[in-house]
Amino acid sequence: MRNKFSLIELISVIAIMVIIMAITLPAFLTMTKGQSVELAAREIGSKLKAVRSYAITNRKYTALVFVTNQAVLSPNYPYKSYRACIVNSSNVFQSWVPDEKWEFFPSGTIIQDISNTTAGYNGGGFGGAANITSVSDAKVFSASTTTDSGIIFKSTGNVVGADAYLVIGEGEYTNGAMNRHNTADSAIVHVDNYTGRVSYGTQ
């Protein structure tokens, strides 16, 4: 019958396990973050398709708005949340789409940019987004109304403005600012201006 493990043997096994974890953990965390980015991009793509469908069915200008200002009551919203709303032809907020609530990106994932050209990927200026004015939600915003970035679909199903490239990637909102991480490895959601078609890609 084999004797019990000695203290030295147990310590050796634990040491080996710690070394293996130290080697594999960074790779595991990187893989997990990458999966979160891909998941967020697909969720946004699906939501954009639903918003477009609502616009066509109800014959109303309908937008997916992202919180891109700092006039908020909680830091959980900027660059990490989105919601469907109805706007008019001048991009002015009218009301929230019935039964729609704020939805959030996976932890550690944000919308890094909305560009209107592939050359403008990830500049962080949101130049390809529509500015939706008079957005109102007393439970979210500290101001009575705000202006936020979004994608607007006309009642015909095509997009207000030029093609839009939504850049989803790693990042966080801290100390009143959006901090982007690993910008070379982002997921792209493309919305075609003329057809409203939503497609995916990577930078």
Enumerate the predicted regions with their spans.
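Positively charged n-region of N-terminal signal peptides that target proteins for export
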Residues: 1-3
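N-terminal helix-rich module
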Residues: 5, 23-49, 53, 61, ...
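Carboxylate/His-rich catalytic cores and anion/metal-binding grooves
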Residues: 8
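Alpha-helical hydrophobic helix detector
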Residues: 11-27
